[in-house]
A protein has these predicted regions:
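N-terminal DNA-binding recognition helix of tyrosine site-specific recombinases/integrases
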Residues: 1-28, 73-75, 174
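DNA breakage-rejoining catalytic core of tyrosine-based enzymes
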Residues: 20-49, 104-128
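Basic, Lys/Arg- and aromatic-enriched nucleic-acid-binding interface segment
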Residues: 45-74
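Short, charged phosphate-coordinating catalytic segments
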Residues: 67-90, 211-212
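Conserved tyrosine-mediated DNA breakage-rejoining catalytic core shared by Y-recombinases
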Residues: 79-136
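Short, polar N-cap/turn motifs at the start of nucleic acid-interacting alpha helices
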Residues: 85-89, 189, 208-228
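Active-site/catalytic core of tyrosine-dependent DNA strand-transfer enzymes
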Residues: 126-186
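Short basic/aromatic active-site micro-motif
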Residues: 165-168, 186-206
Length: 228
């Protein structure tokens, strides 16, 4: 990312996971990794904060902040309901069902979970700003716990974000364009999955063991985590 204008430096409405990082070293490491196209492309915390600054709508901002604070795949984030969150201090967390597990579960008629397969993972929510803003969004937008399915007539758990992957990509594109208008650019293309890669790298910078990160990311194989 290029230099940030003064308003970004002083903005406090953008989320940063509370971890101290040697940013000059982190920038140098990322510059080296960009030589290899096959390695994950990610943003550093100040860049994520800058991007969120250009998302004025609280509902949109909190979806992107959820991707950043949890490392969720976009399908996982869009499936979240209020019941998946426990925001009670001192240890708030979110329960995520991994993408592949959700797909397999929908395809099984017997509803049995394959032996040894964990269907959900718990991800701690360490950013108090994020937790507070999520509570504000739920209260302000009056997001219900359940709603009636107009097609089936059944009462179902209400998803927090009733949008599609394409819509989220549009939101991100609009934020990137707004940032560019202020002279703020990003070193990598930004997609929903960029936030997942960014979360993983941020956790590694914080000293999280690889096996723990594997669990947080919902990787079945450690080899998937080792790409970071």
């Amino acid at each position: 990312m290029q230099h940030l204008p003064a308003p970004i430096h002083h903005a406090r409405d953008a989320a940063q996971l509370p971890v101290a990082i040697d940013y000059p070293a982190a920038l140098a490491l990322r510059q080296m990794s960009m030589v290899h196209d096959e390695l994950p492309k990610y943003l550093l915390a100040p860049e994520v904060s800058a991007l969120l600054h250009y998302v004025p709508d609280l509902r949109r901002k909190m979806l992107l902040a959820t991707l950043w604070n949890t490392g969720a795949r976009i399908n996982e984030a869009l499936a979240l309901t209020r019941g998946d969150f426990s925001l009670t201090p001192p240890y708030p967390f979110v329960q995520l069902a991994t993408l592949k597990q959700r797909t397999e579960k929908a395809a099984r008629t017997a509803g049995r979970t394959p032996a040894g397969q964990q269907t959900h993972r718990l991800v701690p929510l360490s950013d108090s700003w994020y937790v507070s803003q999520l509570q504000t969004m739920v209260a302000t937008l009056k997001i219900p716990m359940e709603r009636r399915n107009k097609r089936t007539g059944r009462t179902e758990k209400a998803r927090i974000w009733e949008v599609t992957d394409r819509t989220v990509r549009t939101w991100i594109g609009e934020a990137v364009a707004a940032a560019a208008a202020d002279g703020v650019t990003f070193s990598v293309p930004v997609t929903p999955h960029t936030f997942r890669h960014s979360y993983a790298m941020h956790m590694l910078y914080a000293g999280i063991p690889l096996k723990v990160l594997q669990s947080l990311m919902g990787h079945k194989s450690i080899s998937s985590t080792e790409v970071y």
